[in-house]
Regions:
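Gly/Thr-rich phosphate-binding beta-strand-loop-beta motif of the actin/hexokinase/Hsp70
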Residues: 8-32, 115
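Nucleic-acid-processing active sites and adjacent nucleic-acid-binding tracks
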Residues: 34-65
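Short alpha-helix plus adjacent loop in nuclease-associated cores
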Residues: 83, 90-127, 279-296
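A short, charged helix-loop
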Residues: 116-140, 181-191
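Glycine-rich, often acidic, oxyanion-interacting loops/wings at catalytic, nucleic-acid
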Residues: 146-232
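Phosphate-backbone recognition surface of nucleic-acid-processing proteins
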Residues: 232-235, 241, 246-331, 335
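Low-complexity, acidic/Ser/Thr- and charged residue-rich accessory regions of DNA metabolism proteins
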Residues: 325-343, 347-415
Length: 415
């Protein structure tokens, strides 16, 4: 699902530029639109190297123009490069010109023309949100951490597969000691030949990814200390610093969503409104009831919210939202569906927090302090002392005062 946060288009320019970009080249179609009823083709550049884009624009594209770029991997970078040299640009959905005509005319310059014509005709009303440089870096950290965890898990599964196939003692699953336990096993069983070489190679890969994961988690923790939005999200039950970092990095500015329901839909946690009997039957075969969730939305947001729902049901059952979840389960609702419902509630609360709405009461203060006590160790005592927090208690009290200090002391936190 494309973000509902799109930037509103500013006043129309005299020249409309459609751009179809690839990894190494792009096609440009420029239209003169002083009369919107009779747009005239001004110039076309059928093939231009991306490295020459700035020079091409300065020599061929008028300043009073706006460039329409189809969403792709490098579209945000191209938009920023154009803005750096004084040209306006906007990114539109990748399906904005997907129709029968496009299927018949699969050419770069034709796509560029169609983008320009779609804007001229008024079919493009808004642009896709582009994250700021800082939050783009946060997203890169998140993607790197996600990929590292995947590679570490794959490597661990390969080690397990070899040990199971050869009848060796299966290695323990804890990360830091896995490599040493496998080396001891190789020595005790006197394993030799290619299998020994293969296990040693996989252990080296596993330890590399483990160190990489720890380094990226340190970067996340450092970012959270400096970002009040991320810290504030940790007030929510089921959200530790990984979830808080990812949700804040992906959303950035909650005000780009007009309501919490829009953010919920963006996360893919809203049930389908118009569903066919076939879709509902497929959902029932998977154990679901009623209308299923759609397959759209940001999977990273959906993942962390549903995981938080599982955590609340298993570990925070005495909280208000945990009690609500178990009431639904006791009424016969499937547990997985209840987890999604809790995740939908959490992303709604997150919308209010990211908007800067003040904490309404002290109900979650106790849980938040315990999270801060645990979070103290993520950066290490030496780093925390440098930041001015000599003990865990000092850090927890300081963070708690930041979000709960405006509330009267008479409103006590629930245990």
């Amino acid at each position: 699902m494309n973000e509902d946060n799109q930037e509103q288009i500013e006043g129309r320019a005299q020249y409309i530029v459609g751009m179809d970009a690839h990894s190494k080249k792009l096609a440009i179609s420029i239209w003169e639109c002083s009369d919107l009823w009779k747009p005239m083709l001004y110039k076309e550049i059928r093939c231009c190297a991306i490295t020459d884009m700035e020079a091409t624009y300065k020599n061929n594209v008028p300043k009073d123009s706006i460039t329409i770029i189809e969403s792709s991997t490098n579209s945000a970078t191209l938009k920023k490069r154009l803005e750096d040299i004084g040209f306006r640009a906007g990114i539109v959905r990748a399906d904005i010109i997907s129709d029968k005509e496009r299927k018949r005319k699969v050419r770069d310059i034709q796509d560029a023309r169609n983008l320009a014509k779609a804007y001229i005709k008024g079919n493009i009303q808004e642009f896709i949100w582009v994250p700021s440089d800082q939050y783009a870096d946060y997203r890169d950290v998140h993607f790197a951490h996600r990929d590292t965890v995947k590679e570490m898990t794959r490597t661990s599964n390969r080690i397990w597969s070899i040990c199971s196939r050869k009848g060796y003692n299966l290695p323990i699953r804890s990360g830091a000691t896995k490599g040493e336990s496998i080396r001891k096993m190789v020595e005790q069983l006197q394993i030799s030949g290619f299998i020994k070489e293969r296990l040693e190679m996989l252990v080296a890969d596993y330890e590399f990814f483990l160190k990489r994961k720890e380094k990226l988690e340190k970067l996340m923790a450092e970012a959270i200390i400096e970002n009040d939005k991320m810290l504030a999200l940790m007030q929510l039950p089921g959200f530790y610093y990984h979830a808080a970092f990812v949700i804040a990095a992906i959303v950035e500015d909650a005000k780009r969503f007009s309501s919490a329901a829009k953010l919920t839909a963006y996360a893919g946690l809203s049930p389908m409104v118009n569903t066919s009997g076939e879709e509902e039957q497929k959902a029932m075969l998977k154990g679901g009831l009623g209308k299923p969730l759609d397959d759209e939305g940001r999977m990273d947001l959906k993942f962390y919210c549903c995981e938080a729902g599982q955590t609340i049901l298993n570990l925070c059952s005495k909280s208000d939202i945990g009690k609500w979840g178990w009431r639904m389960i006791n009424k016969g609702k499937p547990k997985n569906k209840v987890c999604c419902a809790i995740g939908r509630k959490l992303i709604t609360y997150a919308w209010h927090i990211l908007r800067g709405d003040p904490t309404p009461n002290r109900d979650g203060e106790g849980v938040f302090k315990r999270k801060m006590v645990r979070f103290y160790s993520e950066l290490g005592k030496q780093r925390m002392i440098e930041l001015g927090y000599p003990t865990r208690v000092d850090f927890a009290n300081s963070m708690s005062a930041r979000f709960y200090g405006h509330l009267p002391e008479s409103i006590k936190a629930k245990e």
